[in-house]
Design a protein with these regions (language model features):
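Glycan-recognition and catalytic cores of secretory/periplasmic carbohydrate-active enzymes
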Residues: 1-157
C-alpha cells in the first residue's frame, strides 16, 4: 500500500491529545488544532443523508475509523472526542467542548437499551444481523472512559 492511501484518525487525534496533555506552547496548540481539523475533515460525520427508504444508515454524529473501513466506530469517536476535550481544557475553546459533547452524547443514543452495551460500530442493521453485532473490549473501555470524563467535566451523573 502506498503512503497516505489508508488514512486513519487513530494517529492524528491521539497525537493531538498527547501534545495538549503536556505543557504545550502556543505553536504546539496550533499544531494540535490542525491535527484535530484533519481528523474532523476526513473522518467525522455530523449528519447522514437518508437512503432511498428515507432511513439514515448511520447514527450521527460519529467518526469513521479509516478510509478503507468506511464504518463509524466507537473507539474512533472517543479518539476525536478526547482530542476536542483536551483542546477545550488547554484553551477554553467552547466549540471544541460542544463538538466533543455531541460525539459523546451519541454513544448513549446507540447504546443497547436492554443491557447498556455500546456497540463497536454505529451502522444501522436489521434485527437478525444486529444479533451478531460485535463489542470489542478496547472500544467498550474507550466509551466508558470518555463517558466518565464527560460526566466529571459537566458535573452530570
Amino acid at each position: 500500500m502506498k503512503p497516505y492511501q489508508n488514512l486513519t484518525n487513530c494517529t492524528a487525534a491521539p497525537y493531538a491529545s498527547y501534545i495538549l496533555n503536556g505543557h504545550p506552547t502556543s505553536e504546539e496548540i496550533e499544531d494540535s488544532r490542525d491535527l484535530i481539523r484533519l481528523s474532523e475533515d476526513q473522518f467525522v460525520h455530523w449528519n447522514a443523508l437518508p437512503n432511498k427508504n428515507a432511513v439514515r444508515p448511520i447514527a450521527t454524529p460519529c467518526v469513521y475509523e479509516q478510509h478503507r473501513y468506511q464504518v463509524p466506530v466507537d473507539n474512533s469517536t472517543c479518539n476525536v472526542a478526547n482530542a476536542y476535550l483536551d483542546l477545550y481544557e488547554a484553551t477554553g475553546d467552547k466549540l471544541a467542548f460542544a463538538k466533543a459533547k455531541a460525539l459523546i452524547d451519541n454513544l448513549t443514543v446507540v447504546q443497547n437499551i436492554t443491557n447498556g452495551q455500546i456497540p463497536t460500530t454505529f451502522d444501522l442493521r436489521d434485527p437478525e444481523r444486529n444479533k451478531k453485532r460485535s463489542y470489542w473490549i478496547n472500544c467498550s473501555n474507550a466509551s466508558i472512559t470518555i463517558l466518565l470524563r464527560m460526566a466529571e467535566l459537566t458535573g452530570e451523573e
